[in-house]
Amino acid sequence: MAKAVILMMDSFGIGGAKDAAAFGDAGANTFLHIAQNYPEFGGNGLALPNLESLGLANAGELASGVRAPLVSERAKMTLAGRCKYGCMEEISAGKDTISGHWEMAGVPVRQDFGHFPLEYPSFPAEMVARICERAGIPGILGNKAASGTVIIQELGEEHLASGKPIFYTSADSNLQIAAHEEKFGLERLYKLCEIAFEEVKPYRIARVIARPFAGEKNGAFVRTKNRHDYALNPPAPTILDKAKAAGLQVTAIGKISDIYAGSGVTRKVLASGLEELWDKTLEEVQNLNGDGIVFTNFVDFDMMWGHRRDVKGYAEGLMYFDRRLPELEPLLGEDDVVFITADHGCDPTYPGSDHTRECVPVLMFGRKVPAQNIGRRKTYADIAETIAAKFGLEPFGIGTAF
């Protein structure tokens, strides 16, 4: 029996992308800039002893040529010498969540998704009219690019008074719809998003995201954990599909199942927040009998701290992640492997609030994994190729196993 565990540190880029300037992201480096700037926010310095023992600082230096300044602490990882480390370039046309995850699963996105304008009005009037008519809503609020946590404080009370849901977008390929979980209704919000997902297809939009929230007045509204993503299906079989077809178990934790539209997933586990995501990951790894994949997305790095340009929060989240990492070791069998990686960057020191085009780390450890610098990889798909080789699945012919 063997397991492949993928820990996706959403948005934890390590700089050095050769095409960063083409995306307006020259010099962006999520890892390095957090390490350099965290002390200015009252921290004593970024301490990631367990990730560092697995080669994270080396991977960062491979990507950008600069070594991140980390506080030296003793690692608790017994498998510190059983790790391959490197960095990976992205070949997909975008720097969004879907592109990064699909490419890592063996299906690069060669043509960028469609995007709605960031300026008001973001959404075509005829599309909005069709959605309103089909869903039976009196209209919409927002209709612009916005931070989801900010716009519910701005328009939450008006939403409650009018019954109009809040529509907004971002630099990613998406339409996000926020509504009060109780007053508007969670199932009603989900149905609205299903209708909207059908209507955005001609615009090649990757996702419609339901964003339920709770509270009574502006300044006191909070998102609930019942987010749901409606995403396009990958255009070709991913490593998840191939694993499922071969009889392997594929456990998707957090938003992973939604990102792949449920394709290739045998078990979906809902969780939110770093603590619960870690708890569920450890539980699922321990309970998995037989060959399989456990895949977790740690979304807080992106959603809570990257987009909000919160250096302090991001740094503290990284250190929490690092402290939990040794708990995984005792659950690993002789043939199990763990991948630690990311889907894109989101440098909290960079102007704006968008993702940043960066290389991402790839750390692979396990009891039988030799210590090795695997260098600069040409595509995220190398992870899919490596998992395919491990389980004897048909290769993708896109990347190279390591």
Name what the model sees in each region.
Residues M1-F402:
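Feature captures the catalytic ectodomains and active-site-proximal regions of enzymes
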